[in-house]
Amino acid sequence: MSIRGVGGNGNSRIPSHNGDGSNRRSQNTKGNNKVEDRVCSLYSSRSNENRESPYAVVDVSSMIESTPTSGETTRASRGVFSRFQRGLVRVADKVRRAVQCAWSSVSTRRSSATRAAESGSSSRTARGASSGYREYSPSAARGLRLMFTDFWRTRVLRQTSPMAGVFGNLDVNEARLMAAYTSECADHLEANKLAGPDGVAAAREIAKRWEQRVRDLQDKGAARKLLNDPLGRRTPNYQSKNPGEYTVGNSMFYDGPQVANLQNVDTGFWLDMSNLSDVVLSREIQTGLRARATLEESMPMLENLEERFRRLQETCDAARTEIEESGWTRESASRMEGDEAQGPSRAQQAFQSFVNECNSIEFSFGSFGEHVRVLCARVSRGLAAAGEAIRRCFSCCKGSTHRYAPRDDLSPEGASLAETLARFADDMGIERGADGTYDIPLVDDWRRGVPSIEGEGSDSIYEIMMPIYEVMDMDLETRRSFAVQQGHYQDPRASDYDLPRASDYDLPRSPYPTPPLPPRYQLQNMDVEAGFREAVYASFVAGMYNYVVTQPQERIPNSQQVEGILRDMLTNGSQTFRDLMRRWNREVDRE
């Protein structure tokens, strides 16, 4: 009764699909029952073959001897703690050898020449029989030490973690943002002489602590990866491409820690518009206009869903009330069978209407979201094409940075593109001056496919959509408290930002007043990550809703309303979705 294929001698073959690691069957096996062999292999053995297997039961009490071994003094062996320590050393050595044997068992068989070459190199390097064992990386080894130290401090010695509180839940990316911000704060204090040497030194120390925290989190991540997949054979669930982006299957998602990087997410419509011809640009603009018109015409149908959801809820409540009043339960099934001749009761009618209403709302939310993505991508492509068309067909007026007039020396293709652009401007609501010029701010955002709402850029749009934009021009302690209160962290603006500013950090543009800071005990009990991601999700949904629907700012739904309507879409629905999908199918198929 032994585990074959995972033997302790390190020379066994790879276990096959039937659990037998060798071509010939063992002589000790009775019969040809593979199920019995597999059941027997679940139990550990005390034989020499399975003694170094990782599946063997580790008996610690048998390793702690009562008598001192050779080479040790009686005084050192007299204490219980010293004997227990020696037993732990033996357990650690046994686990190390078991890992080595498991590695040699799972690894593929190599030729005799390769093994001879490796044995020769191992004898020269004095590594012995562990030449086939892959050592830990320095980062993973340090992460294991850090994890063991944290476990010993928090669980054994009952000490608090050095990063306890709300900031202890930050991941590597968020800690890296905090390190970058604290270092920039220290530079800002020192450059503008806003603090003395002691204050600057304290800020530098905090920045160093955050940098050390980033390194610790990176090493712990490497250690967790090693523990979850020690052989490096498992395929990762996601492949990260850019910070904040991950792919699951064929779908790309964005869950980054930076609100300012939302416009940099590659959603599939990122085109180099400067390499396209005038005819292609004109076609992209027209396609974007058709997609935008389709979305605008679809909004009344989507708004009609609220009434259908309310009717479904009323039907459900009526059915529940009727059932409770009439006592229509499973116990009264016999009475109901006798009443079949008299017709269905009110409770049965209400329940049947509820079932019919539920059966009438069947739709595919996956295709619904896919069509929304395709149409929004076409709108963004048309916007980017319009930005490039402005560069080609319009010239900037003198004395103004955002007023454009059509050029006179245009080719026939360019003139056609200018006409398409004029229709695009009229449909977008861009006013034309008396002299025939257009007032178009921030054309660069158009060329990237980022919507420009009410003459404001993308950064300003996200600031307005946030309930309260945090103030960056504060001292360190107030800044940290305010960041916890807001539930997210905002990066300082880039140095190449195109709008002029009076300071290194922007003042809030939000119309809402700045609230007073809550007490410290409330700050320490707030959940940073949940509110942080909620703010990112709300700003993104509000941006898409405001751009597609072109409604006033006060009609932007908050995250709770958006989450509720999405949940209703997943669980409920109506014929409106089928009509909507039929219309969107016709629009998507048009090319």
From Swiss-Prot:
Q: Which domain of life is it from?
A: Bacteria
Composition bias, Basic and acidic residues: 490-507
| Stretches with biased composition (Gly residues) | 1-10
* Start and end residues of each stretch annotated as Disordered: 1-37, 110-135, 324-344, 487-517
Bias class Low complexity marks the residues at 110-132
Bias type Polar residues, positions: 11-32
Family according to the record: To C.muridarum TC_0268.
Its recorded name reads: Uncharacterized protein CT_875
